[in-house]
């Protein structure tokens, strides 16, 4: 029997990413694991509905034996079986993130015995998770360059706290994975500001987009790209239908020569449209102020596929606790090593086998 890998869920940032990465890697490598202190660093530790759905989705896809799969559990033992392609459907039962559930199981399905389709119901635009737009516009184009055939479709928007959204991904087995090198993002080609509204007054989106646009003509003069590109940003205000609200999301997509990045914030009761726009502007400005190719959140999403490819590198302005914790977990399962080298403008992250 394979050696059981013992993991401490309280290590590093102590969040759900430790569990999600462990589930993905356990399915792929066939190595069982047991974890204690699940989400110990969060206000509500243990398995929430989103995490429990990820565990049960992984269990179904590989026929795993599992202990501790219940709400609030802070301990889990997971013994995987063979990965099986096919049609899968999972419901979170809350506004928990569909995207995080998908990101848990999709890497395993890159190594399945056939094509797969996975549909998840829950939240699609969540504050503490990649949005469906991020997955479709940012992450999947990079995966395609690595040799991964995966396409996610947003079926219905779902916002916190109601949820009610859905997304589905069709994925094909990968014959081989190629490394990816993202050292420079190149010139900015196009920027698009988009406000999504569901059962929220239209003027909220108009104010968000106007505030976002107004930020950049007065931006610091040493950030060359800002004045050159943001006044020309495309501006869209989209009113959604179909009872998927209330909810509001504002995003700024920055398409560069080497990759696309997307920065988003979400409207909540008691927060003005201008404050939402200021949050997006702050994140986008911080990204453009650095020559690093990859934003902080995308860096987290690249660790697992690069590790599976066994090679690759990227630059990022900040090595977050989330990033470093994910690296530690990956290195427990795979015979790869990451280096995170400080540079004048941030960090150079490399992986090799």
UniProtKB/Swiss-Prot annotation:
CDD domains: RNA_Cyclase_Class_II (cd00874). InterPro entries: RNA3'-term_phos_cycl_insert (IPR013791), RNA3'_phos_cyclase_dom (IPR023797), RNA3'_phos_cyclase_dom_sf (IPR037136), RNA3'_term_phos_cyc (IPR000228), RNA3'_term_phos_cyc_type_1 (IPR017770), RNA3'P_cycl/enolpyr_Trfase_a/b (IPR013792), RPTC_insert (IPR036553). GO terms for cellular component: cytoplasm. One of its GO terms (biological process) is RNA processing. Keywords: ATP-binding, Cytoplasm, Ligase, Nucleotide-binding. Belongs to the RNA 3'-terminal cyclase family. Type 1 subfamily. ATP binds at residues 103, 297-301. This is RNA 3'-terminal phosphate cyclase. One of its GO terms (molecular function) is RNA-3'-phosphate cyclase activity. It comes from Salmonella heidelberg (strain SL476). It is found in: Cytoplasm. It comes from the Bacteria. Its EC number is 6.5.1.4. Catalyzes the conversion of 3'-phosphate to a 2',3'-cyclic phosphodiester at the end of RNA. The mechanism of action of the enzyme occurs in 3 steps: (A) adenylation of the enzyme by ATP; (B) transfer of adenylate to an RNA-N3'P to produce RNA-N3'PP5'A; (C) and attack of the adjacent 2'-hydroxyl on the 3'-phosphorus in the diester linkage to produce the cyclic end product. The biological role of this enzyme is unknown but it is likely to function in some aspects of cellular RNA processing. It catalyses: a 3'-end 3'-phospho-ribonucleotide-RNA + ATP = a 3'-end 2',3'-cyclophospho-ribonucleotide-RNA + AMP + diphosphate. The active site is at 322 (tele-amp-histidine intermediate).
């Amino acid at each position: 029997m394979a050696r059981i890998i013992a993991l401490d869920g309280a290590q590093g940032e102590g969040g759900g990413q430790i569990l999600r990465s462990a589930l993905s890697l356990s399915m792929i490598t066939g190595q069982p694991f047991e974890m204690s202190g699940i989400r110990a660093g969060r206000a509500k530790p243990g398995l929430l509905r989103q995490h429990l759905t990820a565990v049960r989705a992984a269990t179904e896809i590989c026929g795993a034996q599992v202990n501790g799969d219940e709400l609030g559990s802070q301990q889990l033992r997971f013994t995987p079986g063979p990965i099986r392609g096919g049609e899968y459907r999972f419901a979170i039962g809350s506004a928990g993130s569909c995207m995080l559930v998908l990101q848990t199981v999709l890497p395993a399905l890159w190594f399945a015995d056939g094509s797969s389709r996975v549909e998840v119901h829950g939240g699609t635009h969540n504050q503490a998770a990649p949005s469906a737009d991020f997955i479709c516009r940012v992450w999947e184009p990079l995966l395609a360059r690595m040799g991964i055939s995966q396409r996610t479709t947003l079926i219905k928007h779902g916002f916190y706290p109601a949820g009610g959204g859905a997304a589905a991904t069709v994925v094909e087995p990968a014959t081989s994975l190629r490394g990816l090198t993202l050292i420079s993002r190149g010139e900015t080609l196009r920027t698009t500001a988009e406000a999504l509204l569901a059962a929220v007054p239209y003027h909220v989106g108009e104010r968000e987009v106007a505030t976002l646009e107004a930020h950049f003509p007065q931006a610091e003069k040493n950030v060359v790209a800002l004045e050159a590109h943001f006044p020309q940003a495309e501006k869209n205000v989209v009113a959604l239908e179909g009872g998927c609200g209330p909810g509001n999301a504002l995003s700024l997509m920055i398409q560069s020569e080497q990759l696309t990045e997307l920065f988003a914030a979400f409207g909540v009761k008691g927060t003005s449209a201008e404050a939402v726009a200021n949050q997006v502007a702050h994140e986008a400005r911080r990204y453009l102020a650095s020559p690093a190719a990859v934003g902080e959140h995308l860096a987290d999403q690249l660790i697992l596929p690069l590790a599976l490819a066994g090679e690759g590198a990227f630059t990022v302005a900040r090595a977050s606790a989330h990033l470093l914790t994910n690296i530690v977990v990956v290195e427990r399962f795979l015979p790869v090593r990451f280096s995170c080298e400080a540079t004048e403008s941030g960090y150079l992250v490399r992986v090799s086998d």
